[in-house]
From Swiss-Prot:
Name this protein carries in UniProt: Uncharacterized lipoprotein MG149 homolog
Species in which this protein is naturally found: Mycoplasma pneumoniae (strain ATCC 29342 / M129 / Subtype 1)
N-palmitoyl cysteine-type lipidated residues: 24
Region feature Disordered, mapped onto this chain: 160-181
Compartment list: Cell membrane
Length: 320
């Protein structure tokens, strides 16, 4: 898997809107908002994100390259040993190639965590483009001129058992009204950050269960003569395959969760309380009612929706 330094084209998918509900505001400190973003990632990986994320984009690339080199070195040794044991052992060569491909990949969960924390430390590098129906024209605008200048932030939550909508066969997704119930458990699904210039940046980080693709494999039947002629190397190879099948079965029973990231930004004529923003977003997405959200634009000097289209590693200095 090749990693490109222009991270956003891979890891900041352009999403028009995400399902956000009522937010809970927190103190106006950058450290608190950064810590809150960490809470979006999986519990068992959190410490790893904190340690590696603070090291920056170079650490991400270094780690990825190191893993790739290790995989290549292991592959070379394994391939050499396989050829020495039996040059015509197609079975082992195939196994080696498969192990190669899986070992060379950089963990996406870790990269998501690294990237989120790196971006929040370098917000001025984000380049935005106003959302339009014309996809051929892309403006790149720097809306955040200073790093770490977050005004406020709050969690975006949904009811644990609530689904925001469903997709029909024609591909259209419809939202449905629902009633709130007292004591209903809520889960955090995202984070909203506000800035002094009226910009609201929303990050939606969801967990998706990873389902392995079923692969059809044809195996040749063996008679007693084949068993006698089977080499020790071939026997070891078949034992390894049997163990791998058991591991895959366990992974299927306990599927690994992958992270899905989406970001959107809304620019108003002036800043206002983040609770008012998330409250309006709640009615827009959960209740399919955009009236309150549109009224924010009228109340605060207009509103423009932006998507994050790129990242500038050398952003221009703000003019005084």
């Amino acid at each position: 898997m090749k990693l490109n330094l222009r991270f956003p084209s891979y890891f900041l998918p352009v999403v028009a809107a995400s399902a956000f509900l009522v937010s809970c505001a927190t103190p106006n400190t950058y450290e608190v908002q950064r810590a809150a973003l960490i809470q979006l990632v999986e519990e068992d990986e959190r410490q790893n994100y904190i340690q590696k994320g603070s090291m920056g984009a170079n650490a991400v690339m270094t780690a990825a390259k190191a893993e790739t080199k290790t995989a290549e070195k292991t592959a070379t040794s394994t391939k050499a040993a396989s050829i020495e044991l039996k040059k015509t052992d197609t079975d082992i060569k195939t196994t080696t190639t498969t192990e190669n491909k899986s070992a060379s990949g950089y963990k996406l969960d870790t990269l998501f965590g690294d990237y989120i924390l790196w971006v929040v430390d370098h917000l001025s590098g984000l380049l935005f483009s106003p959302k339009t129906n014309n996809s051929t024209t892309t403006q790149k605008i720097q809306l955040i001129t200073e790093d770490k200048m977050i005004l406020d932030g709050g969690n975006l939550t949904v009811e644990k058992n609530h689904e925001h909508g469903h997709t029909h066969k024609n591909g259209e997704t419809h939202e449905h009204d629902h009633d709130h119930h007292e004591g209903e458990e809520e889960v955090i699904v995202g984070r909203a950050l506000s800035f002094a210039n009226g910009l609201f940046l929303v990050v939606d980080l969801k967990e998706e269960k990873h389902e392995e693709k079923k692969e059809a494999k044809s195996e040749m039947s063996m008679n007693s003569k084949d068993m006698v002629m089977m080499t020790k190397t071939e026997m070891m190879s078949k034992e390894m395959k049997s163990e791998q099948k058991m591991e895959k079965k366990e992974e299927h029973e306990h599927p690994h969760k992958k992270l899905s990231l989406s970001t959107t930004a809304y620019k108003f004529g002036q800043s206002f309380n983040i609770l008012e923003f998330t409250g309006a977003m709640h009615h827009k997405t959960a209740h399919n009612n955009e009236t309150e959200f549109k009224n924010l634009g009228k109340k605060y000097g207009g509103m423009t929706e932006y998507t994050i289209v790129d990242f500038d590693f050398n952003p221009p200095k703000p003019t005084k």
